A protein has these predicted regions:
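AAA+ P-loop NTPase catalytic core and its hallmark functional loops
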Residues: 2-157
Length: 157
């Protein structure tokens, strides 16, 4: 499946702050209305654990077929592996999906010195006690969030 984009101002649009605007964007992209309804049902079902943070999307993702395939996979309980050249919108899509589903989004950029504790969590001292400090993968799982594992090819084997 190829990523498809519009070239309007390099795919960038001004900051958006409401999920409603994202759903309007999906309608303009002519995403199958039943898929948009399924997103809404999901959001209602998990409204009590929804991400209510005020962070805004910087960009919108364009690409009807990719949107539909990604949402369908997520609704079926699958994980996504987005692979492709640099600057093709993989992170933008992941952030848009997290916002559409109203889930928290955690971004973890891999590097050569990364170890398991920086991803999952580690012990630390707090108030004279050893306590577990969760990493982004652990926290994402606890919160039912989206975890973007960026530049995974840069990690040590």
């Amino acid at each position: 499946m190829k990523l498809q984009y519009r070239t309007e101002s390099a795919l960038l649009i001004p900051l958006l702050t409401e999920v409603k605007k994202l759903l309007e964007h999906l309608k303009k992209e002519q995403i199958n209305p039943s898929i948009i309804e399924e997103i809404k049902k999901y959001r209602q079902k998990y409204a009590d654990t929804a991400d209510t943070s005020q962070t805004s999307l910087r960009y919108l993702y364009y690409g009807k077929e990719i949107w539909e395939a990604a949402v369908h996979a997520l609704l079926c309980g699958e994980n996504l592996l987005l692979a492709g050249s640099k600057a093709t919108g993989k992170n933008v899509l992941a952030e848009n999906l997290a916002r559409a589903f109203r889930r928290p989004c955690y971004n973890l950029s891999f590097h050569i010195n990364m170890d398991a504790s920086s991803m999952i969590g580690n012990d630390t001292f707090r108030n004279g006690e050893v306590v577990f400090r969760p990493g982004p993968i652990y926290q994402s799982a606890v919160d039912g969030g989206f975890c973007i594992l960026d530049e995974i090819n840069m990690a040590r084997n």
